[in-house]
Swiss-Prot record:
Residues 25-216 are cytoplasmic. The keyword RNA-binding does not apply. Keywords: Endoplasmic reticulum, Membrane, Transmembrane, Transmembrane helix. The gene is Alg14. This is UDP-N-acetylglucosamine transferase subunit ALG14. It comes from the Eukaryota. The keyword Repeat does not apply. Forms with ALG13 the active heterodimeric UDP-N-acetylglucosamine transferase complex. One of its GO terms (biological process) is dolichol-linked oligosaccharide biosynthetic process. Its main location: endoplasmic reticulum. Belongs to the ALG14 family. It is a single-pass membrane protein.
Length: 216
């Protein structure tokens, strides 16, 4: 009985410490100005990639290095990323090459996959993603809705919870979402530092979101 009570007390104490740590991480933190910011970009397939690359294309060279994360079977997004970065390098006369990297992770959920089984594939994707995010240690994560962004953002949040590094998470809801959030958006609403919507109807429903009009 004493052992059980001791274990229960230890578990309770650990839970309290984790909650306190999580609360501290989710609070606002001032960002120290720097010459460059390491950027991790999550690109989904199809329209998600087109939107996020339009946004990345408008960013200055100060966001460097740029690390792109895609699903392991997404060859189309890989080609679009390479094309964007090649065009950036050709248009930038101040540098001979552009500093970017492409990484692949397992999909969180395949098309038509059951919700129950997707829980396990998402956990596996998080297990795979955390070492990657820990190695990169980006200053900022930028994503816009694909399921692939969930394990990356959870991993980025864990870096802060563990006291390794505070990573700013910026989520941009897809332009296709006019009145309701995507599933990824509903999850990242609670985890992101900045949640950007592109329609006033969503801004009304989620007052703490940031509305800048159509940005992609």
């Amino acid at each position: 009985m004493v052992c059980v009570l001791t274990l229960a007390a230890s578990a309770g104490g650990l839970a309290v410490l984790l909650i306190v740590r999580l609360w501290a991480v989710l609070r606002s933190h001032p960002v120290t100005p720097r010459q460059s910011l390491g950027l991790l970009i999550v690109a989904g397939s199809g329209g998600h990639t087109a939107e996020i690359l339009r946004l990345v294309g408008s960013l200055s060279g100060a966001y460097s290095p740029r690390h792109y994360v895609i699903a392991e079977s997404d060859e189309m997004s890989a080609k679009k990323i390479h094309s964007l970065e090649l065009a950036r390098a050709q248009n930038d006369s101040t540098t001979e090459h552009t500093e970017y990297y492409l990484h692949r992770i397992p999909r969180s959920r395949e098309v038509r996959q059951s919700w129950l089984s997707s829980v396990f594939t998402t956990l596996y994707s998080i297990w795979f993603s955390f070492p990657l995010v820990h190695r990169i240690k980006p200053d900022l994560v930028l994503c816009n809705g694909p399921g692939t962004c969930v394990p990356i953002c959870v991993s980025a949040l864990l870096l802060g919870i563990l006291g390794i590094k505070k990573v700013i998470i910026v989520y941009v809801e897809s332009i296709c979402r006019v009145e309701t959030l995507s599933l990824s958006g509903k999850i990242l609403w609670h985890l992101s530092d900045y949640f950007i919507v592109q329609w006033p109807t969503l801004k009304e429903k989620y007052p703490k979101s940031v509305y800048l009009g159509r940005i992609v």
